[in-house]
From Swiss-Prot:
One of its GO terms (molecular function) is RNA binding. Plays a role in maintaining the mitochondrial genome and in controlling the mtDNA escape. Involved in the regulation of mtDNA nucleotide structure and number. May have a dispensable role in early maturation of pre-rRNA. Residues 60-332 are mitochondrial matrix. The chain crosses the membrane at residues 333-353. It comes from Pyricularia oryzae (strain 70-15 / ATCC MYA-4617 / FGSC 8958) (Rice blast fungus). The gene is YME2. This is Mitochondrial escape protein 2.
Length: 901
């Protein structure tokens, strides 16, 4: 009866009174007989060397009085060496295996052999005989003794501890009147009535089972596992070529169930060629597997005239990684989830840090000029710096700037008034480049106002690649840390995942999503900046945040977007997203938004974001002649005062008792200054009132040039720029990058030089703009807008419609005149213009000839087509006359090019 199941066909060939198997001669010869002492076990490792199992403390208790060389078998006795390490009792001897004697966890620490030759067998037996039932509860020998009742008719002859398995083998002798099965049953009943609790785990008790097989006492590093590999081997008594019978699952269950709960029995696959045949028996607990291995290893079972010897070994159970397998088999679900988790982690960790840096950037928390130490030092040294630097150097420039700001005081007051009103619309300041729009708004209209964020679109649009665009935008708003390089890496990962799984992972972000993310974080930071006073006042109980922002427009932050629509064709996405974000800012009353642009067609772009709003707009023009003169004289006055300051020391050294007569150099310098001032009025009329041109003139005058020479060089430089950028540009560049042609640019230059201003619609109807042969310049209106964006011309509007076309800068008027006076350039450009007109007329002739050929192919000439044929013939004649005239003019121009240098 095994585990409650009666196995009739089996006969256990183990040891005990009824055992028929006896140790072989080699085994008996290999063991050492001790007088009055238990038998020991010896393991041979090779010729000339030996290893006693008791070399490991608590692992073996072989007692021997002989030396290793005398106790081991001879080197030629191979059969004896093969059987070393097995427990083979004699008649009336049996073995029990006690579990829960040692902790299993110690086997991973004390797996190595201990370097000692001590003999513990006699000591263990003495301790077993002397130990009491009431003391030494932590002593394993005491636990073994307490587990064996005194009334049990057995005599313990040997104790073999197994630290690795957490138990111990106990060999005993018994009388012929008892059997090992009865002794096992008595021990089990005794432990059930009086359980022995181990000290290391009081929730379990010591278990005991009879050893039915031939245990193998090895000291290999094979830690116990819950899975046993059961190999079905032929018995040793049979021949090597004999086969064994594979046990069924029912038989294995009957053998192993008594030792513990089984979770699974897995037989060897039928198509497997591995021999010997095997099966896997999985226990729920590891100690149950240890008990089964130590009790059943080497058990021989006979069935139907065949015998099978069981060979048991531990085997690591392959755990089913269901989560990992599901994860790897569903990448289309897992990868987007991972991307979402990564995005959530970024939002939770980095967004508060980035928001903090944006607030610090807007409020200027990290600026040196806002620190208390800097302000204290500036107050202490203000008198010295003002007296040395500003009194003689900056007063002239300040005077010129004051004249400039006085002319534009109305604009400054209007902008400041709009910033104090509640209006959910944009403030747009439009002016040509060099008109001082940025200085007007930031230095004057917003002077002394806190919480101003300036976003310059020029470096953002001109940045190389998406990473550069993101980095420049982040720098403009103070958004940090920013990992612009990570998007390139994420794009590569996304591409690899898409190539393998067929679906995008979502790790990479588009340029649009990254821009929106940065602007969204900036909006959150700006809202906190605008509500800073609201939180300090504790107004939360009275009004809400939105109501507070609507009622206090002076508390809102100000966003200045400079160079809006700079290179409109290159940064359309950036401009659209900034405009949408700015619209959200003004509509939610978070901040005022001021756009600074030099593009007169800004309303097309901004109207997409605020289609139902009227913008508050200001247009800046050139300075008047009087203000421009004051501005230049202000710079020159500062230079004169610097020179007078340098001459103070020389004047003091002179005789100060009487008035000193001026020298000839002073008289000549004074007369030169008067001549320059007389020339300045005419030069300013030529130069115009563009602020950048006036500063350029002032710098040249400071260097010692006369106004006439300075103006001449400025005009020459402007002419060279026009020739290089508009007239002599390569055709490939024009067709791929520009929407205008050199012929159209020359047409405007020639006409503006003679008429100063042109009617917009008249230019559109001219053959050069209406029928251009350049593919990229076929749209005349787009060509004019492109030339205006390039600042060659300026388009003025009247009641919202384009009216006139003028030179892009006042100095360009003089440059246009100078270009038309160059005979060679004029002949060359007119030749190109006439050639294009000739091509236009030739195309008209081709169209007329095609239609005439179609009409002539009719079988009968109806009377109704007579008028059409007459019209076409007249048009053909007119075009041919024009071509003839153009050919004569082109011949004359070619003659000029041949003669002139």
């Amino acid at each position: 009866m095994i585990g409650g199941t009666r196995l009739l066909p089996f006969r256990l060939l183990a040891f005990g009174p009824a055992a028929t198997r006896q140790p072989t001669t080699a085994l008996r010869r290999s063991r050492v007989t001790l007088t009055g002492a238990p038998r020991g076990i010896y393991l041979g490792l090779g010729s000339g060397s030996g290893l006693n199992i008791n070399n490991r403390r608590w692992e073996s208790t072989t007692a021997t009085t002989a030396t290793a060389s005398s106790s081991r078998p001879k080197s030629d006795d191979v059969a004896a060496e093969v059987d070393y390490g097995h427990i083979v009792p004699r008649a009336n001897e049996a073995a029990l295996y006690f579990d829960n004697i040692f902790p299993l966890g110690l086997s991973a620490i004390l797996w190595r052999r201990w370097g000692t030759d001590e003999d513990f067998s006699e000591q263990l037996l003495k301790r077993f005989e002397k130990s009491s039932f009431g003391f030494g509860i932590t002593d394993p020998i005491s636990m073994v003794k307490r587990s064996i009742p005194k009334s049990l008719p057995i005599k313990v002859t040997e104790i073999i501890p197994r630290l690795k398995d957490g138990g111990a083998f106990v060999k005993f002798s018994h009388g012929p009147e008892t059997t090992p099965a009865e002794i096992e049953e008595s021990l089990a009943k005794s432990l059930q009535d009086r359980p022995v609790k181990p000290w290391f785990n009081p929730f379990t008790s010591v278990r005991v089972n009879a050893v039915k097989g031939v245990p193998w006492l090895e000291d290999l590093y094979r830690l116990p596992k819950a899975r046993l590999k059961v190999e079905f081997c032929p018995p040793k008594e049979l021949s090597k070529d004999s086969t064994s019978t594979e046990l069924s699952q029912e038989a294995l269950y009957g053998l192993f169930r008594r030792y513990g709960k089984l979770s699974e029995i897995t037989p060897q696959p039928s198509d497997s060629k591995v021999t010997p045949r095997f099966a896997h028996v999985d226990f729920v607990r590891v100690r149950d597997a240890v008990m089964a291995r130590n009790c059943l290893h080497g058990l021989t079972i006979s069935q139907d005239n065949s015998a099978t010897r069981l060979r048991l070994s531990y085997e690591q159970k392959v755990k089913p990684h269901k989560i990992w397998e599901w994860t790897t088999s569903h990448p289309r679900i897992v990868i987007p989830i991972l991307a979402a988790l990564l995005a959530a982690f970024t939002v939770v960790v980095f967004d508060p840090i980035r928001e903090f840096f944006v607030r610090a950037h807007v409020q200027g928390s990290f600026r040196v000029s806002n620190s208390r130490l800097y302000r204290w030092f500036k107050r202490r040294t203000a008198d010295v710096t003002n007296s040395v630097f500003q009194r003689h150097h900056d007063k002239g420039e300040q005077a010129g700037l004051q004249a400039l700001w006085s002319q534009r005081k109305d604009i400054i007051d209007s902008v400041q008034k709009w910033l104090l009103e509640t209006a959910d619309t944009f403030i747009v300041v439009q002016g040509p480049r060099g008109s001082g729009t940025k200085e007007l708004i930031i230095d004057q209209a917003l002077k002394g106002r806190p919480n101003v964020l300036v976003i310059d679109c020029k470096p953002i649009v001109e940045a190389r690649g998406e990473s550069g665009t993101i980095r420049k935008l982040a720098v403009a708003v103070g958004y940090r840390p920013v990992f612009s390089w990570a998007n390139s890496l994420s794009s590569m990962i996304d591409l690899a995942v898409q190539g393998t799984t067929g679906v995008k992972s979502g790790f990479s972000e588009t340029l649009e999503s990254q821009i929106v993310k940065i602007l969204h974080t900036t909006a959150s930071a700006l809202k906190k900046v605008s509500l800073e006073q609201y939180q300090k006042d504790g107004s939360g109980a009275e009004i809400s945040e939105d109501a507070y922002l609507e009622a206090h427009p002076e508390k809102r932050a100000v966003i200045v977007i400079d160079n809006f629509l700079h290179k409109h064709d290159d940064g359309g996405l950036v401009y659209d997203k900034i405009a949408e974000w700015a619209a959200a800012m003004v509509q939610s009353n978070i901040a005022h938004v001021v756009f600074l642009t030099n593009d007169s067609s800004y309303s097309k772009s901004l109207s997409k974001s605020l289609p139902d709003r009227i913008f508050r707009q200001v247009s800046l023009g050139d300075l008047s002649a009087s203000v421009a003169k004051k501005y230049v004289l202000g710079h020159l006055e500062g230079l004169d005062r610097d020179e007078s300051l340098k001459d103070d020391s020389s004047e003091v050294s002179r005789d100060d008792k009487g008035a000193e007569n001026p020298s000839e150099d002073d008289i000549e310098a004074e007369s030169k200054r008067r001549r320059d001032l007389a020339e300045l009025d005419g030069c300013i009329d030529t130069l115009g009132g563009r602020l950048t041109d006036l500063e350029f003139l002032a710098r040249r005058l400071k260097s010692g040039q006369s106004p006439r020479n300075a103006i001449s060089e400025i005009v020459d430089q402007s002419s060279s720029e026009i020739i290089k950028m508009f007239l002599l540009a390569k055709k490939s560049t024009e067709s791929t990058q520009t929407q205008w042609s050199a012929e159209q640019a020359w047409f405007l230059i020639k006409e503006i030089a003679s008429k100063t201003s042109l009617r917009y619609n008249e230019v559109l109807l001219s053959p050069t703009f209406a029928s251009s042969t350049t593919p990229s310049a076929a749209d005349g209106e787009a060509a004019i807008e492109a030339l205006a964006a390039a600042e060659l011309v300026t388009v003025t509007s009247h009641r919202g419609r384009p009216q006139t076309i003028r030179a892009g800068r006042p100095v360009y008027q003089a440059a246009f005149t100078q270009l038309t006076q160059d005979a060679v350039l004029k002949a060359r450009m007119n030749l190109l213009l006439l050639t294009e007109l000739s091509k236009v007329e030739a195309k008209n002739i081709d169209k007329v000839e095609t239609e005439l050929a179609l009409l002539g192919a009719l079988p009968k000439q109806p009377r109704e087509v007579t008028d059409r044929v007459t019209y076409l013939l007249g048009k053909l004649h007119s075009s041919q006359v024009k071509i003839s005239e153009l050919d004569r003019e082109m011949a004359m121009l070619k003659g000029v090019l041949v003669r002139e240098v």
